[in-house]
Regions:
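The feature marks the first
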Residues: 59-62, 80-88, 92-132, 136-137, ...
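C-terminal structural cap/anchor segments
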Residues: 320-360
Length: 422
């Protein structure tokens, strides 16, 4: 406990030192602009169409659109360990959006994390990944967003605790952590792999959720795509080894990224938005490239579901977890966990059950999952949450039953683990 306090104090000291240095640098280097003329962008239709495709590949709408709000008008609240950050309006409204931004201003934000007024952005806007974007692609996205309908939606003020609310401190943070490229999590050299690396590491910024983060919120680039719990639902390990260990292979990943339901899993929570707003719109060639990068030029074979120890399996099948499954889950998922195609996910070999960390399974059990529509007219019916029906011990028992019987895991979920997630 004392060590943790010392670590936190050291972190604050580092931040404060960075703030002091940054303020000095900022006074000399940051040339901010306010006011200015409204930009009129008359871009060719082909460039706007290309920009739309790239904006979808970059998943801009997922963050810059609030639930039930206008697309790209901002307002989405993003929770972090440092406070709440609100996504901004990036429609061409001159007063609330980026209507006065030039293409150079837009590029500076994507590449350097600097706003038009010279203030640093927080890395909730993933310039840490977008830094690898080509200028041509940035200009195409700019041409697209400047054709959107201007929305007079005011931006909400970011709410961070001291000293993280001092934006100039981000200059010091950038000096420490901003790099020109993000390491690859797989091995390859083919044209498809190279394109997939750009789609995953730059446009799609997969590492912003799937890469572990350090004490000051920086991506731990020594562990790219190894998984991290940035929010309530964890982003799992999507390295080649991590994907293969849960039964994923190229064909099922292609289907999953294009449709949201494929092979051993279906998308929910934030990943559902990624599928619907972004990866479903990729061309077949880019879909294949993304999969090639995620698995590498020489993909590892998908691991078969390991057989459960007969004694452990017998105990699970005759225990209270099975009783609760039959009472609460079997009506939809079936007694044998086979689910219903395009309606209820199958549990046998399910990717979430095969995760070593039970977090996502427990969150789904406690919170439930709302109805989800997917491309190609597929949809999954709502799953109710059982937080009010299951005690911590019962939820742990049910999770252990599911993981042992259909996930190849050990019955090691404890009641305390459930309690921590309530």
């Amino acid at each position: 406990m004392k060590f943790r306090r010392l670590v936190k104090l050291a972190a604050v000291a580092v931040v404060l030192a960075a703030v002091a240095v940054s303020a000095f640098i900022a006074i000399r280097l940051l040339g901010g602009k306010t006011g200015g003329a409204v930009q009129v962008v008359n871009a060719p239709a082909e460039l706007v169409a290309r920009g739309k495709y790239l904006a979808e590949a970059a998943d801009c709408a997922a963050c810059h659109s609030a639930p039930a709000g206008a697309p790209y008008a901002g307002g989405l609240a993003m929770q972090s360990g440092f406070g709440t950050i609100y996504a901004t309006n990036i429609t061409p409204d001159p007063d609330n959006g980026i209507g006065r931004w030039s293409a150079d201003d837009f590029w500076r934000a994507l590449h350097d994390g600097i706003r038009r007024d010279g203030q640093p952005l927080y890395p909730a806007m993933p310039y840490t990944s977008y830094r690898g974007m080509t200028r041509a692609d940035a200009d195409a996205i700019y041409a697209y967003v400047m054709q959107l309908r201007p929305m007079k939606v005011a931006n909400r003020r970011t709410q961070l605790g001291f000293p993280y609310d001092i934006r100039l401190g981000m200059i010091g943070w950038n000096l420490l952590f901003l790099t020109d490229s993000v390491p690859a999590a797989s091995v390859g050299s083919s044209a498809a792999w190279q394109r997939g690396r750009y789609l995953a590491n730059v446009l799609g910024h997969c590492g912003e959720c799937h890469t572990p983060r350090g004490m000051l919120g920086q991506m731990e680039l020594s562990e790219p795509l190894a998984g991290f719990a940035l929010g309530r639902v964890a982003a799992p390990d999507i390295t080649p080894a991590g994907l293969a260990s849960r039964g994923w292979m190229a064909a099922s990943l292609r289907t999953y990224l294009g449709r949201g339901i494929g092979g051993p899993g279906s998308a929910f929570s934030d990943m559902h938005q990624v599928i619907v707003l972004s990866t479903r719109n990729l061309t077949a060639e880019d879909n294949d490239a993304l999969v090639t990068f995620l698995l590498g030029d020489k993909p590892p074979p998908p691991a078969p579901l390991p057989p459960a120890d007969p004694a452990i399996l017998g105990a699970a099948a005759g225990g209270p977890g099975r009783t609760d499954y039959v009472a609460l889950c079997a009506g939809c998922h079936g007694l044998e966990g086979n689910g219903l195609p395009n309606t209820v996910v199958a549990l046998r070999g399910n990717s979430t059950l095969r995760l070593a960390d039970p977090r996502n399974l427990l969150v789904a059990m406690l919170d439930g999952i709302g109805p989800e529509n997917f491309p190609h007219r597929a949809s999954l019916q709502a799953m109710p949450g059982f937080a009010d029906k299951l005690s911590d011990q019962q939820a742990a028992g049910l999770a252990n039953y599911l993981r042992v019987v259909w996930g190849g895991q050990k019955p090691d979920v404890a009641a305390a683990t459930v309690r921590a997630l309530r």
